[in-house]
């Protein structure tokens, strides 16, 4: 995905600093929104999942919650719930706008797992299951269109529920037919 940032939103680092960043384990913000304070004492808002590795190099301060390393699979659903009701925005990856594969990618990233960006690529990772009854909370569920192309992904929860980004990050029922939206009273995927 091609995007843009304001030239006020980045700082150049040298080769030595880059090597240090690449060597250190990844650390991410774990609050919905928190602030970092730069060396000019300006507050900068950062969303859930922001990479905090450069804080020391840039002499920024951060007092919020952090997460790093590979977490137990049981933590995936609780991480997903942090995004609940975030609005849908194609290409988005923050609580201020997120799409289905950006949602699963960010939830897994916060738990120490790397997923591809698009749902059809994520579907190629891991091991496929034959039946929904074989799934566990934290597993990914993929949905295809009439042509067989993967177009949607969500995270399996307990009791035949799924959390996914469709209009917003929401919880719906899931069965062998697909995702049942209680608002529209129909299967949407």
Segment roles from a protein language model:
Residues 146-147:
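A flexible loop/linker signature enriched in serine peptidases of the S9 family
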Residues 18-34, 106-122, 157:
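Short, basic/aromatic beta-hairpin or loop at an interaction surface
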Residues 1-86:
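Boundary regions of SH3-family modules and the immediately adjacent low-complexity/disordered segments
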Residues 50, 138-139:
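Structural motif
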Residues 88-136:
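Catalytic cysteine-centered active-site loop
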Residues 140, 150-161:
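Catalytic nucleophile-His microenvironment captured as a short glycine-rich beta-strand/loop
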Residues 12, 18, 129, 157-189:
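Aromatic- and glycine-rich peptidoglycan recognition patches
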